[in-house]
C-alpha cells in the first residue's frame, strides 16, 4: 500500500 502513496498520484491518494 505504501507503494501506491509513492506513486505519481498526489491528486488521487489511494491510501487516503
From Swiss-Prot:
Which tissues and organs express this gene's product? Erythroid cells.
One Gene Ontology term, aspect cellular component: chromosome
GO molecular function: any one? DNA binding
UniProt keyword Nucleus present: yes
Which keywords belong to this entry?
Chromosome, DNA condensation, DNA-binding, Nucleus
According to its UniProt record, where is this protein located? Nucleus; Chromosome
User: Domain of life here?
Assistant: Eukaryota
Which GO BP annotation is one of this protein's? chromosome condensation
Tell me its family.
Answer: Belongs to the histone H1/H5 family.
Q: What does this protein do?
A: Histone H5 performs the same function as H1, being necessary for the condensation of nucleosome chains into higher order structures, and replaces histone H1 in certain cells.
- Protein name per UniProt: Histone H5
Q: Which organism is it from?
A: Coturnix japonica
